[in-house]
Amino acid sequence: NQIDEKFLFAAEHIIDHAETVLMKKLNEHVLIALTDHIAFAAENIRNGIVIRNKLLREIEALYHEEFSIAQWAVDYLNHTLAIPYTYDEAGYIAIHIHSGHSGQTSNHRSIREVTIVSEIIQLIEKELRIDIHSEQMALNYSRLANHLRLLIQRYHNQQYAVLDEEIIEIVKRKYSGSYAVAKKIRVLLTKQYQMSITSEELGYLVIHIERLRG
């Protein structure tokens, strides 16, 4: 089942553009993965199958530069291949680009990162009864999403946030409602993803959650 050359050429052009913008070389695995992806997406479009990207907002917040390149890529694909790719595809393409310049040989880690952030945000929305994705919360949403991304990266790199013990105790007492939500996040991370987070990380989470109550 050979892939049409037009998809290969398109993927090469997108990678060239990404490397120019990011001023970084992308991993060689990206070419095959991206070619496969845009060919598969084209087949879905031909068959009338619409796949919505439920992680689009998180991908845009976490990988902003890659997402901007991916939006350019969708316009380029629509124009060059005359196939109506949707902006949902920008999310998937951004993941490929991010994985390609962050030393990963597959998308697994990037997708896991975005999924964890999305699940935590859903939990916070449910507990606080708010819509974090609303326009008036855009700045706090972006801060929270990036804080969560760094938390996950610190865990993987075995690095630890530093926060004075006294401050942790004050935060727990003063923001007891947000602390209760942060503890639920810790349970989610432990049960679903086998990630244990420190009391310092928990303290920072409480501060971010409290900011959302604003």
Positions of PLM-derived features:
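A cross-family "folded-core" feature that marks the main globular domain of proteins
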Residues: 1-214
